[in-house]
Amino acid sequence: MDVPKPLPSSLSSFAAPGDVMVRPLLLKPQWMNGLSERLLVSHYVNNYGGALRRLNAIRKRLAGLDWARAPAFEINGLKREELIAASSVILHEIYFDSLGGKGDSPPTGREEPPAELARALERDFGSVAAWRAEFTAIAKALAGGSGWAILAWSARLGRLVNQWAADHAHGLAAATPILALDMYEHAYHLDFGAKAAAYVDQAMGNLNWERIGARYRSAIGEQSEDKLFLPYGSPAQEEARISPEELKAALADAGDRRPVLLDVCLPKDLARRTDMLPGATVRAPGALARWVDDLPRGRPIAVYCICGFQVSGKTVTELRQRGYDAKAVSGGITAWHAIGGATVPLELSTYEDLAQVR
């Protein structure tokens, strides 16, 4: 059997020195039914981003530890916190990946599991409806406390299992999560207050079954579609994308290889914005022909929008067709926020379609 190709994930960063890299949002927050953009962005930036930043800080502490002399309490404390932070990062990535309907359009609430996964759910739970009833009951039972409801593949048990987890590090040994529902209060309080059950019902109507199915195929050793794990509209070519971490390092260069920053955003989306990356120029993507000749030919160009979807992707494609060294910032300014990147107040004086901003 061929070795399955791993899904694109910040998990790969664990095998290399340095920071674990942020994973872009694959959903459009404003498209979710019954889950507000404010809730989802706050959850991603503050809770997922906070866990990611905490994990990287812990890893730096561990890298400098003198293992021969470090006291047991320090080793225990750091390794415990590393486990909690790493598990939080991974479960949050699976959670956000699992939401978003079909990805290229708002969820309808009528999406169904792909055939292979549906057959597995029927085999292991009797029916898709029976699985859903059990999974949602587990999630709702966690209301008022904290934890995760997880659907995981266990090779040892030879089946899919619904898992109750009281915290980030509470998991079935050697099982591979394919769906995770965050039941910590931060996942729902802004929209639902204490009504956790209402949040569960709304979240279950926003699932992206294509990506959940891809995780299942990867877990059982089959190939998965990598394109499902890129933000919709993001350039497929790796050389046309730059991570927020790579951009942060590149911006530290004071020379002629320092990227030119372009903030491209539709007028209707700018109305929701308050900040931008330092040194960026805000341009209207629909007016590219009017400003493209102002760009320097000898400098790399980093293009970002809110979440790194088709607005920045289309702009980068057009710039590269015109011979510019342009790259889309994966995850947009939302992922930049999640890594704690600096911003300044939004300045719209250069925006060509300012009259359309509402």
What are these regions (language model features)?
Residues 63, 194, 255-256, 341:
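Residue-level recognition of short, well-ordered coil/turn positions
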Residues 224-253, 259, 267-302, 307-358:
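Rhodanese-like catalytic fold shared by cysteine-dependent sulfurtransferases
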Residues 2-229:
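Feature for soluble, non-membrane regions of globular proteins
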